Amino acid sequence: KVEAIIREEMDGLGAQEILMSSLQPKENWLQTNRWDAMDVLFKIPSQTKKEYALGPTHEEIVTPLVKAFVSSYKSLPVAVYQIQTKFRDELRAKSGVLRGREFVMKDLYSFHLTQADLELFYQKAMQTYLQVFARCGLQTKVVEASGGAFTKKFSHEFQVLTDAGEDKILTSPSWMYGQNSEVATLEEGDACPDHPEEKLEWRKGVEVGNIFDLGSKFAEAFDLAVTNEAGERQPVLMGCYGIGVSRLVGTIVEACHDERGIIWPKNVAPYQVELISLRSKDEAMQARISEVALGLYEDLMKQGIEVLWDDRANASPGEKFADADLIGLPLRLVVSEKMLKENSVEWKERVKLEAQMVKLEDVVEMVGEFVSS
């Protein structure tokens, strides 16, 4: 579901989805002088004595790829993206999917004739990223950071404030921006630039995305140039834009939980509804519970509503409720002997403490409204 949101937003940005090789020739990395410069590069020897890198990023592949298709300024701008497994030889792989040596990433690359066009796309990409994260139920800060191995310019990170984070971010509660500790020019206790009544403070954050203005660095390495309107050859300008997809899922959990378990935002919940049927010692009542639960399940599924049905016969009500809170789907419906005597089901939203009774004949319509709201 996270990937579907990303694809929607990338397509809306005018980017085309492709899929590139994870195995990358050493020669490409030598051309950009990054074979020895990037310390997280997995290097793989082949039986033919050739060396390859397991892709941590794809500038070395996408640049010569675009070169094969673009020769005129009339073909620009171009934007391509992929969602693919990446590999980085992290010294401190930890925290599950938040920092691993193998992870899923969406990487977008844009190619432009002029700096003005690149900057325009860069700003559009920034707004699109904010939209992606908002749709995933997250509040993010746009944070100035170092360009690292990608560029000497500053980059922008998208940080989610959580104690599970490794990055130090200087920001304030109402400020949508911030500065990474690597490049901070402001200090703790300074007045917030946009909200002077608030003081800046250091917070921990998880980086869920980043965007870079690459300039002509990679284009020059691969001689990616086009003939401009004046008939002159000029290097193409590039931007790259990443979202850690698997890290994003882990960050949603870190940001959206309580002591009982996960609280999935509606847009990315694995299912929209958890249906629980409780056992009855009375045979006729048990048959009625099963009949009503099955009917509800089928009616909701027909409406396109995703339902996880806990019909385990060997689990107690307490176990089922605890597991429902742990899994954290947005809505829990309970069919039980007590409820059916009232011709009702129990309705409990994961974000609320209190449950309520809803008449059987109203349930499907109410669930539809809840899911779409």
Model-derived segments and spans:
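NTP/phosphate- and nucleic-acid-binding module
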Residues: 1-373
